[in-house]
Amino acid sequence: MDDWKSRLVIKSMLPHFAMVGNRQEPRKLQESGKKPSWMEEEDLSFLYKSSPGRKHQGTVKRRQEEDHFQFPDMADGGYPNKIKRPCLEDVTLAMGPGAHPSTACAELQVPPLTINPSPAAMGVAGQSLLLENNPMNGNIMGSPFVVPQTTEVGLKGPTVPYYEKINSVPAVDQELQELLEELTKIQDPSPNELDLEKILGTKPEEPLVLDHPQATLSTTPKPSVQMSHLESLASSKEFASSCSQVTGMSLQIPSSSTGISYSIPSTSKQIVSPSSSMAQSKSQVQAMLPVALPPLPVPQWHHAHQLKALAASKQGSATKQQGPTPSWSGLPPPGLSPPYRPVPSPHPPPLPLPPPPPPFSPQSLMVSCMSSNTLSGSTLRGSPNALLSSMTSSSNAALGPAMPYAPEKLPSPALTQQPQFGPQSSILANLMSSTIKTPQGHLMSALPASNPGPSPPYRPEKLSSPGLPQQSFTPQCSLIRSLTPTSNLLSQQQQQQQQQQQANVIFKPISSNSSKTLSMIMQQGMASSSPGATEPFTFGNTKPLSHFVSEPGPQKMPSMPTTSRQPSLLHYLQQPTPTQASSATASSTATATLQLQQQQQQQQQQPDHSSFLLQQMMQQPQRFQRSVASDSMPALPRQGCCHLFAWTSAASSVKPQHQHGNSFTSRQDPQPGDVSPSNITHVDKACKLGEARHPQVSLGRQPPSCQALGSESFLPGSSFAHELARVTSSYSTSEAAPWGSWDPKAWRQVPAPLLPSCDATARGTEIRSYGNDP
């Protein structure tokens, strides 16, 4: 019974500290289905309870309480009363695991180690997961409880000293001390662990320290995460097998969280809240665990597992919750994602890494950052979309919303964020910079960025620019978000955007040159750019688009007559956009113009035909530009290059035109003959070179114009984009309110095809020609 007494003392102590108001936890643990695994041991516990051993337990508990009062006073003065119960229950449990007295002792002793050496403790914590798995496997059901309790005690600063005292208590046998020593030795990171840490590229101390601080901070999230890990481990019996070896160490992990002090019980208890995230954790952690498992020196496995789990959770959980939080996963977002140990970010809901949009909303920025690092590799590996995603990720990192698309977002959070912040705050700057940085994601980034929430379907694209729009411009965000629904098209247009990447790269100078204009455009440039675009849309919201399919020129002609509309748009949008239009129009005009066109089209059809031409260019820039180039706008088929060029030239000319009042029109019309001819020439060349792409771009773009025109479903990809546009429309409408009726739909649809590679070349030329106009 001495062994039992010592165990009871330790266990009762652990519950006292760990219970911290969770005295019912042991019962919960038992009730939570631990009994089945404890049946045998529980039977023993009952025997012990009925046997004089229980008296010993009471005595030991009293002794413990005496000691406990000292420590509990430090942790929680009220524990002594509550502790008795947990102690009894724990003692019962301990008696249950009486078969493993040494294990229980070791576990009890281990927690101090966990508390003292964060790296070693972390290693033990990782092993505690294994230990918990063992309880799950039924290897040491009693021990798991003991371990969780110990963990909880470890969480409490006083508990460690209390453990030490317990160790010094005569009830604690030397056996326990020996086990403790062994555990301590095990805890020391082994060369293998260090190697694993190096390989993982994460400092074991950091994760360990993070985990430990979480435990010290009584980070419930970490316990949840740990529970997830434990569950993952439990699910992965490989770890469970190796766990048995690490039984003593497993105690430390529970120390992370008080509530989770009962690894198994807490598992069921925590599972309630982190069950979903645990499921994710399991899949993620399990996936990672196999990796960490190979080097399974108990301590090493812990480090490897923890690092791996953290890495996996970082990628998965971090992307879901907080990419940046992974390091502190438990600390920064403890409450948000308790389930996720690696990244207990505020989004436990996003169990699936990419799918859950909720995660991005809370603190996707950090997640994006972290995720971008961890996920960027996988996301980028995935496809160009991954690249786009990277951009999106970066923007998402900056933007909480993009979170759902953590994988894609994460890849380029830095890029997108930098573009947002770097080039211009303006949407165009964001679009341009993100697109430029991630050429394929220029419009794509901008579009997806705009609807972090709506664009979940297009995670990669959305991810690319969600952050950008948010940062850059709320209205633009609405447009972008509205465009994001266009992400549907964007998915189709993504390729186009990839082509556009080149154009974006070329276009970047414009945005840089017109960074001021871009900023203004972001504020007003959207309106300014869209005035031209809006004009065409206004001209024939629905018909022009479909008409553009066959005869963009004719519509353009009417739109030119509607030049008067441009003023309306400008008035509506605050004409300041002339200068901004040049830079912003290129990137933002396509998107903003479409929406503005839609809104303004509805609002006004007075703006100058130049604006209308610009919009038409946006709608059918390729055709129209080509027509201008070939002097037969109607004959020219809408082509991405021409369209893009027209749009780009319109954008670059927008400033001059808005200044001249006819920049876009002159592009298409002789008014700004020099600009128009050169632009058309470039566009024509680019269109001719990339004529095949032009249709795509024009299609991608037309959907926006179609939407702006009211025939969103006109284009092939438009129906879905139209739906998205509607959804986003409502979503963007609120955000796009500043722009009035601006139809985000048009925005969404426009961007993707706006910048085909040919268009990029033409646009680049155009930009070079007019990039300095602003």
UniProtKB/Swiss-Prot annotation:
<dbReference type="GO" id="GO:0005654">
    <property type="term" value="C:nucleoplasm"/>
</dbReference>
<feature type="compositionally biased region" description="Polar residues">
    <location>
        <begin position="386"/>
        <end position="397"/>
    </location>
</feature>
<dbReference type="GO" id="GO:0005813">
    <property type="term" value="C:centrosome"/>
</dbReference>
<protein>
    <recommendedName>
        <fullName>Mastermind-like domain-containing protein 1</fullName>
    </recommendedName>
</protein>
<feature type="modified residue" description="Phosphoserine">
    <location>
        <position position="676"/>
    </location>
</feature>
<dbReference type="InterPro" id="IPR026131">
    <property type="entry name" value="MAMLD1"/>
</dbReference>
<comment type="function">
    <text>Transactivates the HES3 promoter independently of NOTCH proteins. HES3 is a non-canonical NOTCH target gene which lacks binding sites for RBPJ.</text>
</comment>
<dbReference type="GO" id="GO:0005794">
    <property type="term" value="C:Golgi apparatus"/>
</dbReference>
<feature type="region of interest" description="Disordered">
    <location>
        <begin position="257"/>
        <end position="279"/>
    </location>
</feature>
<keyword id="KW-0804">Transcription</keyword>
<feature type="region of interest" description="Disordered">
    <location>
        <begin position="656"/>
        <end position="678"/>
    </location>
</feature>
<dbReference type="GO" id="GO:0008584">
    <property type="term" value="P:male gonad development"/>
</dbReference>
<keyword id="KW-0010">Activator</keyword>
<feature type="compositionally biased region" description="Pro residues">
    <location>
        <begin position="331"/>
        <end position="361"/>
    </location>
</feature>
<feature type="region of interest" description="Disordered">
    <location>
        <begin position="755"/>
        <end position="774"/>
    </location>
</feature>
<keyword id="KW-0539">Nucleus</keyword>
<dbReference type="GO" id="GO:0006357">
    <property type="term" value="P:regulation of transcription by RNA polymerase II"/>
</dbReference>
<feature type="compositionally biased region" description="Polar residues">
    <location>
        <begin position="656"/>
        <end position="669"/>
    </location>
</feature>
<feature type="compositionally biased region" description="Low complexity">
    <location>
        <begin position="574"/>
        <end position="609"/>
    </location>
</feature>
<keyword id="KW-0805">Transcription regulation</keyword>
<feature type="region of interest" description="Disordered">
    <location>
        <begin position="525"/>
        <end position="609"/>
    </location>
</feature>
<dbReference type="GO" id="GO:0016604">
    <property type="term" value="C:nuclear body"/>
</dbReference>
<keyword id="KW-0597">Phosphoprotein</keyword>
<feature type="region of interest" description="Disordered">
    <location>
        <begin position="442"/>
        <end position="473"/>
    </location>
</feature>
<feature type="region of interest" description="Disordered">
    <location>
        <begin position="310"/>
        <end position="365"/>
    </location>
</feature>
<comment type="similarity">
    <text>Belongs to the mastermind family.</text>
</comment>
<feature type="region of interest" description="Disordered">
    <location>
        <begin position="386"/>
        <end position="421"/>
    </location>
</feature>
